[in-house]
């Protein structure tokens, strides 16, 4: 059985979020929380919140045991990009892309044995 949580249109670049999400993929949930708490990246608290939601979904919706949960899938997709302009010299302007992310975490119960 699998439980899933998704955070859509989060204001962090997918490239930066992937650095953190790669650290927790395949880990036990308790270990993943410990890694996220000690990772000094802006994406860490956001991903921790999504992981907490996935664990709550597993416990509440599917009656899974929290102690046996493993992060089976964790990925970041690109969300819509906010396009902004930065004024430059001599009346010019440069485009600034403020990227957003869709963060998905799937947890499943580890098989005993």
Swiss-Prot record:
Pfam families: Ribosomal_L22. Keywords: Ribonucleoprotein, Ribosomal protein, RNA-binding, rRNA-binding. CDD domains: Ribosomal_L22. GO terms for molecular function: rRNA binding; structural constituent of ribosome. One of its GO terms (cellular component) is cytosolic large ribosomal subunit. Part of the 50S ribosomal subunit. This is Large ribosomal subunit protein uL22. It comes from Geobacillus thermodenitrificans (strain NG80-2).
């Amino acid at each position: 059985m699998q439980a899933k949580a998704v955070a859509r249109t989060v204001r962090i670049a997918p490239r930066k979020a992937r650095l953190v999400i790669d650290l927790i993929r395949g880990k036990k949930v308790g270990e993943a929380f410990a890694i996220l708490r000690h990772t000094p990246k802006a994406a860490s608290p956001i991903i921790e919140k999504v992981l907490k939601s996935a664990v709550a979904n597993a416990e509440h919706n599917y009656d899974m045991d929290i102690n046996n949960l493993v992060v089976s899938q964790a990925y970041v997709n690109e969300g819509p990009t906010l396009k902004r302009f930065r004024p430059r010299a001599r009346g010019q302007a440069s485009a600034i892309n403020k990227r957003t992310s869709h963060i998905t975490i799937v947890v499943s119960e580890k098989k005993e044995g």
